[in-house]
Regions:
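Structural signature of the two symmetry-related core transmembrane helices
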Residues: 171-185
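Cytoplasmic helix-loop-helix junction between adjacent transmembrane helices
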Residues: 1-28
Length: 293
């Protein structure tokens, strides 16, 4: 959501962004949890009403923004007010030239591709594996897993964000990688529903940490003059892992079997976590050397 993220960045500072993005993430997931439930009740007998409610809620969500949120595009005075030693200082040039001046962000984007490939297993590897383990009960149990995921996001987002608020975004993302590794990796040993649910708890905690802190990190390292464009490019490239995951995972399943993909997913997530930790150390050294806040 480049436009929404850019508007949120404009309205917050580095101290309040994590809380703001966590609330946005929480609200989005409440809608994701409630939407299918409402659809299940309405879609068979009240199809027209279903689409009317869908359109109405979209319009209603826009009204507060139109009425109370002023244009957030930074003025020239606001751009000039950002200190030269701040990572959000304004830049001159097109998106690609400006991005090349920020190698840490480029590295972050490509590491995020691995994260998204791992996380994408919730919608590809997990349902296939549930079918493999539970047979005819696979779809039903996968529905339970996704319901648990939605409930966990709604219940735990505020607690997770509050608990990790003082930790740097890249460290949080590194921790998220370990949680994703444990959550998906343990499926190798899982043959009962309760183990799948423990797995879901772990990778959902990783999902929360990764999603919220990715938005915060990109926001804190985007120039005030290119916020929406940076968000667009980062989202497009980093989320390409979701496109690659089914292709690569499908080939692996054919070659080595669905059970044996989970150790590979585990190693990928651990590697991404360690690389992200290394990126944090590199950024810290560069920032100290250049005097960037």
């Amino acid at each position: 959501y480049p436009a929404v993220n850019a508007m949120l960045i404009d309205k917050t500072d580095k101290k309040t962004r994590q809380n703001a993005f966590s609330l946005l993430y929480l609200g989005t997931n409440i809608g994701i949890a409630v939407g299918p439930l409402m659809a299940g009740f309405l879609i068979n007998d009240y199809l027209f009403l279903f689409f009317m409610i869908d359109a109405a809620t979209t319009i209603i969500s826009l009204i507060p923004i139109l009425l109370w949120v002023k244009d957030t595009l930074p003025t020239e005075e606001e751009k000039e007010s950002v200190p030269e030693d701040d990572s959000e200082r304004a830049e001159i040039g097109n998106i690609f030239k400006v991005l090349l001046r920020r190698p840490v962000l480029i590295a972050f984007i490509f590491i995020s591709i691995i994260y998204s490939m791992v996380y994408a297993q919730y919608s590809f590897g997990v349902p296939l594996f549930a079918d493999h383990v539970f047979g005819l009960y696979g779809p039903r149990y996968y529905g339970i897993i996704m319901t648990v995921n939605a409930v966990l996001v709604v219940v735990f987002t505020i607690f997770i964000v509050s608990f990790t608020a003082r930790i740097r975004p890249l460290i949080n993302i590194s921790i998220a990688g370990i949680l994703l590794a444990l959550g998906f990796g343990m499926l190798y040993f899982s043959e009962a529903l309760y183990l799948f649910l423990i797995s879901t708890f772990l990778w959902t905690m990783g999902e929360i940490l990764f999603t919220v802190n990715t938005s915060v990190f990109v926001a804190n390292n985007s120039p005030i003059s290119h916020r929406a464009r940076f968000n667009s490019v980062v989202f497009f490239v980093s989320q390409s892992g979701f496109a690659l995951a089914p292709l690569i995972t499908g080939q692996l399943i054919v070659s080595i079997g669905i059970v044996n993909i989970w150790p590979i997913i585990f190693l990928l997530a651990v590697a991404a976590s360690l690389i992200m930790l290394g990126l944090y150390s590199f950024q810290k050294k560069v920032s100290l050397k250049q005097g960037i806040k």
